[in-house]
Structure formats: structure tokens, C-alpha cells
């Protein structure tokens, strides 16, 4: 009997190894997921760079215990090693397809099937629910349709007045900081949050006692999201509950959600009593807010209370952080490039200074300033990565993607591709003059994403940014303090730097 087992053992081992090898061609067994294959049967490495891993379990342990700084560097290093090719990682339960080329990004972003966001966005669900950023299929289509009127030209004109008022308040604050180092990270986010709060909810955040707590809660929620982003094990809710800042997230979500929910209830009461647009208790006519569009949709049965909360929280989150990030980097680049700042001043100095005498059309004519904003977004996209998920097996870019494949589109790399932008690290606003964009790939510059899931509020954001830049440049010269070499970039929901970005303001003569 012993001899039979002894002689049979090699055969069993041989069969097991053959079976393992056969299965492992289709499945990455130790990573518990199906492999990506080529549609034409060619070697996978001929189509895509397969990134090496630290262990036999795929790339799962490559990201453990990273900081927001080190994970950003890891992503950039991985792209550098791929040498301009798209590349592949394998995580537990799912492969991740990383896209760094505009050509392949186009197919993804233009697809009518690949509209579901990837697992990273699941981390936002406790805050944003099923809002426009995260929702998919019919819910997304109906919500997008319902919200589109909130960004109509006439609505933007009414928002322009709010932007101007907040700019005037900010300029008064900035006058107190003249000839001193100014930390942009301390003043700009407050400006954008005030803007988005009044345009989304119809209330002035500075007038509310809860305003400070709300700002603090948003910041705390982002800190927890940052923690989860830096460790894939925290994506698991049980692991996060046991070892992460779960209670911190819950407590601050309660503050943020109660704030927006209370405002919604007050606005709903006015809506039902047909008092919107009438004078409030201070004798001021109440302005339109994005929330009014949602309340009208609720009255028509298109959305419920939770849906309204989700959309308001989504707009507050997206409109606050991304815009402030763009403004901070643009002001930094203006400080570092005096010639560009001078051209912007020449373009805006004849704009009417009175909000009653200015229109969206006049800001649309600030062509050079828009080129400056675009170049800033190209170098420093507010959202450096966007994601999709395959909800079913299908062919993408000539590759057979298994169900649940995660797709990561690296906007940071795509918009620094030397094939589309010569001297890609240089700040050159002229590259966005119409004559210089003729032969450029249409998906080489996509800071607001593209296709049907592009950012619904991009015109809102560009207008808000122009209004603030015009106000600052009209009143002050911006001088550099922080240099690009001083900065350490961090990866999060939005692009951040470890250091606060500082400039120095001096009054303009003969303003």
C-alpha cells in the first residue's frame, strides 16, 4: 500500500500542476480573479504592460500602508515604468486596467456601456449616496436630465451676482494681507464653499451659526476618505470599522447631512407656499438655487427626499473642493509667471467693476484667461484620476475584460503626454489658442472628464474661477513665495500638496 501511494504521489502532483497551470491561464488563482486576455489571442504583453508585483498574490500588497504622498509617487512611478503604455494590475477579486493614453481613454469615455464608476467611488457613498457622481443606469439618466436646467445660461447669470458678492468680500480680506505671505489653502476654500452653498442651497454660509461646523465636518470627512484611499484593506467596511477612523466618519457625516437636510426642509416649505422669489425677512428678494430645480422635480414625482439630499451633497462636494484646487494652482502659476499675469491684467482691466453692469458674455470673452485656466488644469487636474467598472465581460481596447474589471484613467498622465503637448511640464497658456489645438487629439485634454458622464457643472466652475481671478488680478499683483520644487503632491479625491501654497500680494498702482 505504501509503495502504491509512493508511486502515485508524483502522478498526482503532475496532474495537479497541469490543472493549476491550465486554470491559471484563465484565472489569477492567488488573486481570486479572472485574467484579462487579448481579443485576437496574441500575447497579453504585446498589447499592455503587465506591472510586476511584490508577491505571488498580485499587486494587493504593493499599496499597503502607503501615505497620500507615497501613493501618488507610486502611481507616477508605475506610469513611468510602463513607458507610455497602458498597464495592468491584479488586485483581490478584480484586475485594474490603467489608461495613460488619450486614444484608449476615448473609447472608455465615449462608451454608452462603461458608465458605472469603479470601487474607489464606493468610498464616497456614505457621504454622497446615489448622487449624480456615483449613480448609474436609469437613475443617473433621469437625474442628469432633471439637473441640466440648473446650469442654463440664465441661471449662470444669476449665479454671477453671487460670485461677485463673494469676491468683493474676499478682496476686503485680502487687503488685510497685503505685503505679507498669504496661504491660499486657508482663504480660497472658504470662498468656493460660500459660493457653492448659496448657489446650491440658497443660503449664505457666513450667516449661519452652523457654517463653521459644516466646513469642519467636510474637511474631516475628506481626511477619512484620504485614509481609506491609502490602504486597500480599508475598502472593506469591517476592516475599516475595526482599525480605521470609522467613528470619526460617522460623526462628521451626521453633522454634514443634518446641515443640508435642515436647509432643504426650510427651502421646501418656501417652495410649497409659493414664496420663492419673494422678499425674505430682511427685505431681500430670494434668489434661485439649484435646490429649487430638485424641489420642482420632487413635486413632479421625479425624485424623493433622499435623492434631493444626495444631489445637494454631491454638488456641494464637487463644486467646493475641485474649484478651490484649480484656483490655488492657477494663482500660484500666475505668481510664478509675471508675463502671463500681465496679459491677464490687460485683458480684464476694462471689465465693469459693478456686478449690475456685467454679464456672463463678458466673462466668456476673456479668452486668454480661459487659456491660463486650461493650462493650469492640464498641469494640475483637480481630479487626477477617474474610474469605471465593467459590469459585464466585454472587449475594451482589443482586450477581453472580465466582469468587475476596474478601469483607472490617469488624467494627470494623459494631459502631460509629450505626443500631444510639446514641453509638457512647461506652463504655456498659448497652447490653448484655437490655432494651436487643431490637430490635437480631442481626448488629450479632459480635466472635466468627457462623453456623456462629463462634469455637468464645468461652465459653472470656469465662470466662478474667472470671476475670482479677475477680482484678484484687478486689485493686486501676485508675487511668488512657494516654488514648484517646494511642493510634494498627494493623492486623494482631489489633487493636493503636502505644503500649503503661499503667495504675496501687493496693491496695483493706478488701478
Swiss-Prot record:
Gene3D superfamilies found in the cross-reference section: Cytochrome P450 (1.10.630.10)
GO cellular component: endoplasmic reticulum membrane
Domain of life: Eukaryota
EC numbers on record: 1.14.-.-
Topology in the lipid bilayer: Peripheral membrane protein
Pfam families, alphabetized: p450
Keyword Heme: yes
Cofactor(s) named in the record: heme
Keywords, ordered alphabetically: Endoplasmic reticulum, Heme, Iron, Membrane, Metal-binding, Microsome, Monooxygenase, Oxidoreductase
UniProt xrefs under InterPro entries: Cyt_P450, Cyt_P450_CS, Cyt_P450_E_grp-I, Cyt_P450_sf, Cytochrome_P450_Monoox
MF annotations from Gene Ontology: heme binding; iron ion binding; monooxygenase activity; oxidoreductase activity, acting on paired donors, with incorporation or reduction of molecular oxygen
Keyword flag Metal-binding: yes
Subcellular location(s) per record: Endoplasmic reticulum membrane; Microsome membrane
CDD domains named in the record: CYP4
Entry binding sites for heme: 318, 455
Top-level EC class as recorded in UniProt: oxidoreductase
SUPFAM superfamilies found in the cross-reference section: Cytochrome P450
Similarity comment: Belongs to the cytochrome P450 family.
Function noted in UniProt: May be involved in the metabolism of insect hormones and in the breakdown of synthetic insecticides.
Protein name, per record: Probable cytochrome P450 4ac2
Species of provenance: Drosophila melanogaster
Amino acid at each position: 500500500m505504501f509503495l502504491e501511494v509512493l508511486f502515485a504521489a508524483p502522478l498526482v502532483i503532475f496532474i495537479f500542476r497541469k490543472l493549476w497551470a491550465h486554470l491559471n491561464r484563465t484565472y489569477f488563482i492567488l488573486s481570486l480573479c479572472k485574467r484579462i486576455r487579448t481579443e485576437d489571442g496574441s500575447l497579453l504583453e504585446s498589447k499592455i504592460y503587465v506591472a510586476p508585483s511584490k508577491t505571488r498574490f498580485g499587486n494587493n500588497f504593493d499599496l499597503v500602508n502607503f501615505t497620500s504622498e507615497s501613493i501618488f509617487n507610486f502611481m507616477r512611478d508605475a506610469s513611468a515604468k510602463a513607458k507610455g503604455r497602458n498597464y495592468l494590475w491584479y488586485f483581490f477579486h478584480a484586475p485594474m486596467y490603467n489608461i495613460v493614453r488619450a486614444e484608449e481613454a476615448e473609447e472608455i469615455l465615449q462608451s454608452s456601456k462603461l458608465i458605472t464608476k469603479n470601487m474607489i467611488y464606493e468610498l464616497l457613498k456614505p457621504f454622497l449616496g446615489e448622487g449624480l457622481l456615483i449613480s448609474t443606469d436609469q437613475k443617473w439618466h433621469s437625474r442628469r436630465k432633471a439637473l441640466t436646467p440648473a446650469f442654463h445660461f440664465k441661471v449662470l447669470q444669476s449665479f454671477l451676482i453671487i460670485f461677485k458678492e463673494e469676491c468683493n468680500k474676499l478682496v476686503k480680506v485680502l487687503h488685510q494681507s497685503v505685503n505679507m505671505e498669504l496661504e491660499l489653502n486657508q482663504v480660497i476654500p472658504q470662498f468656493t464653499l460660500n459660493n457653492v452653498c448659496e448657489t446650491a442651497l440658497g443660503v449664505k454660509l457666513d450667516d449661519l451659526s452652523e457654517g463653521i461646523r459644516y466646513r469642519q465636518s467636510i474637511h474631516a470627512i475628506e481626511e477619512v476618505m484620504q485614509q481609506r484611499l491609502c490602504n486597500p484593506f480599508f475598502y472593506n467596511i469591517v476592516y475599516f470599522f475595526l482599525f480605521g477612523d470609522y467613528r470619526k466618519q460617522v460623526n462628521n457625516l451626521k453633522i454634514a447631512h443634518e446641515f443640508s437636510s435642515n436647509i432643504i426642509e426650510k427651502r421646501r416649505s418656501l417652495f410649497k407656499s409659493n414664496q420663492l422669489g419673494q422678499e425674505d425677512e430682511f427685505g431681500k428678494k430670494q434668489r434661485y438655487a439649484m435646490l429649487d430645480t430638485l424641489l420642482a422635480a420632487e413635486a413632479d414625482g421625479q425624485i424623493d427626499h433622499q435623492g434631493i439630499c444626495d444631489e445637494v451633497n454631491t454638488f456641494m462636494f464637487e463644486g467646493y473642493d475641485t474649484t478651490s484646487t484649480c484656483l490655488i494652482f492657477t494663482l500660484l502659476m500666475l505668481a510664478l509667471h509675471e508675463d502671463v499675469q500681465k496679459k491677464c491684467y490687460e485683458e480684464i482691466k476694462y471689465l465693469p467693476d459693478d456686478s449690475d453692469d456685467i454679464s456672463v458674455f463678458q466673462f466668456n470673452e476673456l479668452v486668454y484667461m480661459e487659456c491660463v485656466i486650461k493650462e493650469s488644469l492640464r498641469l494640475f487636474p483637480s481630479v487626477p484620476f477617474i474610474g469605471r467598472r465593467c459590469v459585464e465581460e466585454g472587449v475594451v481596447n482589443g482586450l477581453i475584460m472580465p466582469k468587475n474589471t476596474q478601469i483607472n484613467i490617469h488624467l494627470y498622465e494623459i494631459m502631460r503626454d509629450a505626443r500631444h503637448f510639446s514641453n509638457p511640464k512647461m506652463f504655456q497658456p498659448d497652447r490653448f489658442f484655437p490655432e494651436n489645438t487643431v490637430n490635437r487629439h480631442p481626448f488629450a485634454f479632459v480635466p472635466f472628464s468627457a462623453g456623456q458622464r462629463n462634469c455637468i457643472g464645468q461652465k459653472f466652475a470656469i465662470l466662478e474661477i474667472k470671476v475670482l481671478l479677475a477680482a484678484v488680478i484687478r486689485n493686486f499683483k501676485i508675487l511668488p513665495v512657494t516654488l514648484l520644487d517646494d511642493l510634494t503632491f498627494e493623492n486623494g479625491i482631489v489633487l493636493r500638496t503636502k505644503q500649503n501654497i503661499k503667495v504675496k500680494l501687493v496693491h496695483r498702482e493706478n488701478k
